[in-house]
């Protein structure tokens, strides 16, 4: 390995090294520097990825820091940093201590970065499972709540099935193509007219495994239980960066043009069922985290709708929505985490009047819900607009109409929460009035992205266009 190779993989090395360093520091000075080191490492990895020059973006050790990989490494690193900021005071309230929490968050970000930079299927699988193993720990890390352990067990069992599907699918694709290099696998197994049954079985298993990772119907049943039982900052991370990594997985594998037709039908049904089931089930929920869980299922259906086009325009809409969705869900779950006390605020009705007692957190939550509903001038409106625009341009008109109607239905359950936030001031719980400094930083950053992209999306659109060239 040359110095140039080390330079290229330094963002990965920073994240992996920081995870180990936090654990070592915990043995010397327990409970003091984990969050600070973790946030610094995430910001450092993001900055390093940003400064890598195109001439240096060669492949080494099965990874290649292309503009695509750099973009997602920055996104995942900053999302991990925001998660650590949201977690700091929440974990104190929940009595979640120890360096394993920040170390595992950083290790999850490392796995996500590996996924986005993968140049062959083996590294892609290892990165995906590295982040999944990290979430097995994070989901069950609240030892004081039986719900957390239950959620962790469900996620572990179903995650093992997903991993088996993906591993078997990769094995079949290797048998069909004779190589693990992603471009060659795509060319040999999804070229126009390719009908190798082994390759088709491999792609089918891959789609089943990824459907679990991003909570597409019918592989969605784990989502509401895990979201309800896991610590809320972990849910913020799981619902954003984890799904972003799985979407990056798909974008690396899915071809554009005629080869995409092979996968069109299964993806079409996954999108349709996810949009309908996610939104209709969310209407029936009284628990806020379960409602947001079903909402996330529908949101993934919108993303797959744009993927269906098989065009660069559709892929650009997907990347835009990944960024927007990350900011929206970080703000929503981050605000819920900040509002949640040791007793907990579980149901939508528990938030009645909270807008008056804790205006900052309630305002962030309301903004996030407006964005998730796709109301202008938030980033959610811009994201949905480009998804449906790409779908219409790509010929997916019936499914796009279903998506628009489903999005209109979703406005009811999002706005129901907002109404509760600002009605009946006397019902507001008496407790601390403001967010902590770390929570305020993370929530303000997410809100800024929601508003900035909603009002002036052009810089982000140009950046996305450049990484897809």
From Swiss-Prot:
Entry keywords, A to Z: Cell inner membrane, Cell membrane, Membrane, NAD, Quinone, Translocase, Transmembrane, Transmembrane helix, Transport, Ubiquinone
Uppermost EC category: translocase
Membrane topology category: Multi-pass membrane protein
Domain of life: Bacteria
Primary location: membrane
Gene Ontology CC entries for this record: plasma membrane
Compartment annotation: Cell inner membrane
Matching Pfam families: Proton_antipo_M (PF00361)
GO molecular function: NADH dehydrogenase (ubiquinone) activity; NADH:ubiquinone reductase (non-electrogenic) activity; quinone binding
The EC number(s) this enzyme carries: 7.1.1.-
Family assignment from sequence similarity: Belongs to the complex I subunit 2 family.
Role noted for this protein: NDH-1 shuttles electrons from NADH, via FMN and iron-sulfur (Fe-S) centers, to quinones in the respiratory chain. The immediate electron acceptor for the enzyme in this species is believed to be ubiquinone. Couples the redox reaction to proton translocation (for every two electrons transferred, four hydrogen ions are translocated across the cytoplasmic membrane), and thus conserves the redox energy in a proton gradient.
Subunit text: NDH-1 is composed of 14 different subunits. Subunits NuoA, H, J, K, L, M, N constitute the membrane sector of the complex.
Protein name: NADH-quinone oxidoreductase subunit N
Organism: Geotalea uraniireducens (strain Rf4)
Species lineage: Bacteria, Pseudomonadati, Thermodesulfobacteriota, Desulfuromonadia, Geobacterales
